[in-house]
Regions:
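Non-catalytic accessory segments flanking enzymatic or RNA/DNA-binding domains
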Residues: 1-304
Length: 304
């Protein structure tokens, strides 16, 4: 994988249904089986922000430094960004108004361990949004403006009891013991029927739209066979080197020289520059703060 040198890492994102590490002004496609070798800079700077319907990113006016382990934006730029308004409903009044009047999808997303969450996304970003979250599958259940979609999401959360947030550890847990696609689809459709009976809405579809997303992540066999070491923070001057074995949502999965599978959140890379590989580095993946997500090697009903 060819990585531009002396360019800032902006984000790990999904473009045309494929994961890319956006560096400088171009995207580098992350392909399973390819090697990755980057050295992060000694300093980390805010990546700026993108407003709703804007085509270009606005640089941070303060060129603010960002500590490792945090999001790649300073507080000012974070609150200017369309994603902040989309998540919270707050922010610039005009941007909030534009977002709330735009079409949104209401969806159910399925994760490992039969965890199902409810969420909303801009209609034109609906498939990208569930890929960013690392959902195994999703069911689009309704369409309406931002206000109507959020109201339905809130009712489903409070009246049906679905979560609106899933921990990364849960998303990476038991990936080798997932049930069949049919089982997942039936589980989502069962929740959809329950929602219609408890809290019907005029923006809900008569027939929901199911998408099976697992193949998009191109998970290598190592992910199913090994414990996953979740990187808790990426400090300055870290060398990230290994073979890509998948991208789960916004998390890069790598096998390093020690044969372990490491999960590196894209948000920890955002803001660093990729410096020359000959540069001195202080840290490697094996020396970072890690949390083990054990592989479930027990047989399940679906193995019989």
């Amino acid at each position: 994988m060819d990585v531009p040198q002396n360019k800032q890492i902006i984000e790990l994102s999904w473009q045309n249904m494929r994961p890319e590490l956006f560096i400088g002004d171009s995207g580098v496609t992350l392909k399973t089986g390819e090697s990755i070798d980057i050295v992060l800079s000694e300093h980390r700077y805010c990546v700026g922000y993108v407003r709703f319907k804007a085509r270009e990113r606005t640089p941070c006016q303060d060129k603010a430094t960002i500590p490792s382990g945090k999001e790649g934006q300073c507080n000012f730029c974070k609150q200017q960004d369309a994603s902040f308004t989309a998540k919270t409903g707050y922010g610039l009044s005009r941007q909030a108004g534009d977002l709330l009047s735009a079409d949104h999808a209401v969806y159910l997303a399925y994760f490992a361990d039969d965890v199902i969450k409810v969420g909303v996304a801009l209609w034109e970003r609906r498939e990208v949004r569930v890929l960013e979250q690392g959902a195994i599958a999703c069911l689009f259940i309704g369409r309406g403006n931002g206000t109507m979609a959020r109201n339905l999401e809130r009712k489903i959360h409070t009246q049906v009891g679905l979560t609106e947030w899933v921990r990364l550890e849960t998303k990476l847990k038991n990936l080798q013991k997932l049930p069949t696609q049919i089982h997942i689809q039936l589980a989502l459709e069962g929740i959809f029927d329950r929602i219609r009976s408890i809290t019907p809405s005029q923006i809900m579809f008569d027939t929901p739209d199911f998408h099976y997303l697992l193949p998009s992540y191109s998970l290598g066999p190592e992910v199913a066979e090994s414990d996953i070491l979740l990187v808790q923070s990426v400090p300055e001057s870290t060398r990230i080197s290994g073979t890509i074995v998948g991208v789960m949502g916004s998390t890069l999965l790598i096998t390093a020289a020690d044969a372990h599978v490491y999960a590196v959140g894209g948000r920890y890379l955002s803001g660093f520059h990729c410096v020359d590989l000959s540069s001195t580095f202080k840290h490697q993946l094996a020396g970072l703060e890690l949390k083990k997500i054990p592989a479930n090697r027990q047989r399940s009903l679906f193995d019989i």
